[in-house]
Amino acid sequence: SEIFIAGLLKEIPADVKYIVVSEAGASIYSASKLAAEEFPEFDVMQRSAVSIARRLQDPLAELIKIDPKGIGVGQYQHDMKQARLDEALGGVVEDCVNAVGVDVNTASYSLLSYISGINLASAKNIVKYREENGEFTYRAQLLKVPRIGAKAYEQAAGFLRVPGGKEILDNTGVHPESYEATEKLLALFGYTRDDVRNGNLKELRGKVTKAGSAKVCEQLG
C-alpha cells in the first residue's frame, strides 16, 4: 500500500505527502462496544479506518479507547498475571492522560474517565451536560455536573483544560487553589495574563532558578 501511494503521489502535481500511522489495536477498537456506540452505521473496517485517522489528529485521545494489552507491550505480556498487568497498564495510561491534560469541551467520556477524580459515570455526565448546555467557559462549572462534588472537582480541576474560557489559567495545568500564588509569581517577574495567553513564559523558569526558588516562595508567602 505504501509503495502504491508513494508512486501515485509522484504523478500528482500538487505538494501532497503521506504519513504512516500504526494500526496496532485498531481491529480491537473496531469490534468494541464503544466503537459501535460511536459509529453505529459503520462496519468494522470503516470504524478501524476512522480510528487510525484519528490517531494522527490526537493519538492519546484515540489510543485510550483500546485495552492497552491490545496495542502490544511486549512478547511476554501474557506470561504475567492479567490482574497485575491490567493494573500496571491502566496506571500508565492514567498517568499519561493526567500529565497531558484534556480539553473538557472536546474530550470523549472514555478519555475523561481517566482523569483523577472522575469515573465513567461522571465522565458521561460531563459530556451530557456539555451537549445540553453548551461548552464550558470556566472550570468551576464542573460543580454543576451531577456526581461532580467538591472533592472530585478538587482532584480533577488541574487536569482539565478550558481553551478560550473566561479565566486564562483554566487552560493551564495550574490548579484553581494556586491561582492567587500564580498571579503573584507573574507580577513578581513582570509578566501578565496576556503573557500566559500568548505563551511568553519560556524564560520564567530560568528567572525563578536565578532568583532562588526558596527566596521566591518566601516572597510569595
Can you name each region flagged by the protein language model?
Residues 99-221:
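Accessory alpha-helical DNA-binding modules that contact the DNA backbone or grooves
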Residues 58-129:
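Charge-patterned, long linear interaction tracts outside catalytic cores
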Residues 1-90:
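Phosphate- and other anionic-substrate recognition elements at nucleic-acid/protein interfaces
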Residues 36-39, 79-93, 155-161, 210-219:
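Short, charged low-complexity intrinsically disordered segments located at boundaries
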